[in-house]
């Protein structure tokens, strides 16, 4: 993601808790995010009720499969890497369009 771009993320039920966070890495197959929680999901765990709020578009609701999770002492948050489960084609397009726009902006402002 480009510097300054915020992609809020929330998980409706992580061990009984609604968790908010922010994506720092995004692709059509998965996401890296910082979450405001001390709860530690396990590798392979499926999280449902996930909402990803891409700028200037409707919120994207999905499920995630945790690939890694660890406490990040520098940010005092939980850092996760996860893959999307069961994205619809329209959701994949939504993410791909957002990422393409990010790339266009990056090229426009840093045309190396």
Spans of features found by a protein language model:
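Extended Gly/Ser/Thr-rich low-complexity repeat segments
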Residues: 42-55, 92-104
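Beta-strand secondary-structure signal
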Residues: 8, 32, 49-51, 63-65, ...
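Residue-level recognition of beta-strand microenvironments
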Residues: 26, 67-71, 87
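Short conserved beta-strand and strand-loop elements enriched in small hydrophobics
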Residues: 4-13, 44-60
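N-terminal helix initiation/capping motif
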Residues: 1-28, 34-39, 96-112
């Amino acid at each position: 993601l480009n510097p300054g771009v915020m992609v809020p993320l929330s998980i409706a039920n992580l061990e009984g808790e609604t968790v908010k966070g922010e994506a720092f890495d995004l692709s059509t197959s998965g996401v890296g995010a910082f979450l405001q929680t001390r709860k530690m999901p396990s590798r392979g765990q499926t999280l449902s009720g996930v909402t990803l709020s891409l700028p200037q578009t409707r919120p994207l609701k999905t499920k995630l499969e945790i690939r890694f999770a660890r406490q990040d002492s520098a940010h005092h948050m939980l850092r996760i890497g996860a893959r999307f489960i069961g994205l619809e084609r329209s959701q994949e397009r939504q993410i791909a369009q957002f990422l393409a726009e990010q790339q266009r902006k990056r090229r426009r402002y840093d045309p190396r």
